[in-house]
From Swiss-Prot:
This is PPE family protein PPE15. Contains nine predicted mitochondria targeting signal sequences (MTS), majorly spanning the C-terminal region of the protein. The C-terminal region (amino acids 312-367) is disordered, hydrophobic, contains a eukaryotic-like SH3 (SH3e) domain and shows similarity with the C-terminal region of mitochondria-targeting eukaryotic pro-apoptotic Bcl2-family and BH3-only proteins. This C-terminal region is required for secretion. This region interacts with host TLR4 and NOX components. InterPro entries: PPE_C, PPE_dom, PPE_sf. One of its GO terms (biological process) is response to host immune response. Belongs to the mycobacterial PPE family. Disruption phenotype: Disruption mutant shows a significant decrease in the biosynthesis and accumulation of lipid droplets containing triacylglycerol and in its tolerance to rifampicin. One of its GO terms (cellular component) is host cell mitochondrion. Keywords: Host mitochondrion, Secreted, Virulence. Its main location: secreted. The gene is PPE15. Induction: Up-regulated in tuberculosis dormancy. It is found in: Secreted; Host mitochondrion.
Length: 391
């Protein structure tokens, strides 16, 4: 199309007839917004993949995932740049339109020039309007040239603004057969689960039969070995009255002997258990006798024989008891230091130094007269005889 061949009425009408630069500016803003969103998505995508493969997930699988994701990341980056370029080109087209619109002669001015020319031609008597007609034609020619120049410039600017980067859909980053394989795996798992359920149901239903069939091998063994007939004969023999009476008598007799032996066994056990205390008591008595003999020897050595005397054939009486003559003088010496316990009628002899470390517990002191008692008496009581001196 040659805009110079078109009159200004057409060029001006076309320039003023459109919607203006508004739609192109809106398109440029939309492209810029899309470019910003794609750029943000690409940056987030790259950040997530980098953090995932360098911190949490490392290995051949992560490297394979990175290799599969790289084409999509490259597409996001390229598409964001292409969208931004398209937005800028749209803005450039809008600016070119604004410039062409400003250079174009308004259609009203062109129409007024044509109306003036028609009036001058109609009233041109004797050529008096010829100069005015020539000026009007010259002005119209300028309008023609101006509109043509505006359209040529607008066409050039629009052609440059229309150079956009080609866009393409993203490449496939996953295996196209993955969904089909997943569906097949799910179907196989469902079929396997159904088969397993059927198998479990069959097992549960067959358990009673299997348990009840455990007795069949025993029966078959008895039948194959001929033991079933022998067992039947034995049962018949045991069922006869004579054999049954003999067996019952033997069982009853054995039971009677067992019942009679139980008390005897209990008695023997008790007797065996009581032997230990008796042995302990006998050992204690022997130890007491040995200690008493040692104490008597020490006491005899510690008694001084001075002042003692005896008459041959005579004995000293203690009550109705005949005792050696030495007891009448030796006994007071052993009880001279006796002290009475407060609040009781018992007396305890004071200890005396001597070769004997201690007296045997249970030795009674000499009598102090009617109503006097020695210390507590318990256990074995030895009788100590002092050494007699014959004068």
């Amino acid at each position: 199309m040659d805009f110079g061949a078109l009159p200004p009425e057409i060029n001006s009408a076309r320039m003023y007839a459109g919607a203006g630069a508004g739609p192109m500016m809106a398109a440029g803003a939309a492209w810029n917004g899309l470019a910003a969103e794609l750029g943000t998505t690409a940056a987030s995508y790259e950040s997530v993949i980098t953090r995932l493969t360098t911190e949490s997930w490392m290995g051949p699988a992560s490297m394979a995932m990175v290799a599969a994701a790289q084409p999509y990341l490259a597409w996001l980056t390229y598409t964001a740049e292409a969208a931004a370029h398209a937005g800028s080109q749209a803005m450039a087209s809008a600016a070119a339109y604004e410039a062409a619109y400003a250079m174009t002669v308004p259609p009203e001015v062109v129409a007024a020039n044509r109306a003036l020319l028609a009036a001058l031609v109609a009233t041109n008597v004797l050529g008096i309007n010829t100069p005015a007609i020539m000026a009007t034609e010259a002005l119209y020619a300028e309008m023609w040239a101006q509109d043509a120049l505006a359209m040529y410039g607008y066409a050039a600017a629009s052609g440059a603004a229309g150079m956009l980067q080609p866009l393409s859909p993203p490449s496939q980053t996953t295996n196209p057969g993955g969904l089909a394989a997943q569906s097949a795996a799910v179907g196989s798992a469902a079929a396997t689960a159904a088969v397993n359920q059927v198998s479990v149901a069959d097992l549960i239903s067959s358990l009673p039969n299997a348990v009840s069939g455990l007795a069949s091998p025993v029966t078959s063994v008895l039948d194959s070995t001929g033991l079933s007939g022998i067992i039947a004969d034995i049962d018949a023999l045991l069922a006869t009255p004579f054999v049954a009476n003999i067996i019952n008598s033997a069982v009853n007799t054995a039971a009677w002997y067992v019942n009679a032996a139980i008390p005897t066994a209990i008695f023997l056990a008790n007797a065996l258990n009581s032997g230990a205390p008796v042995a302990i008591a006998e050992g204690a008595i022997e130890a007491a006798e040995g200690a008493a003999s040692a104490a008597a020897a020490g006491l005899a050595d510690s008694v001084t024989p001075a002042g003692l005397g005896a008459s041959l054939g005579e004995a000293t009486l203690v009550g109705r008891l005949s005792v050696p003559a030495a007891w009448s003088t030796a006994a007071p010496a052993t009880t001279a230091g006796a002290t009475a316990l407060e609040g009781s009628g018992w007396t305890v002899a004071a200890e005396e130094a001597g070769p004997v470390t201690g007296m045997m517990p249970g030795m009674a002191s000499a009598a102090k007269g009617t109503g006097a008692y020695a210390g507590p008496r318990y256990g074995f009581k030895p009788t100590v005889m002092p050494k007699q001196v014959v004068v």
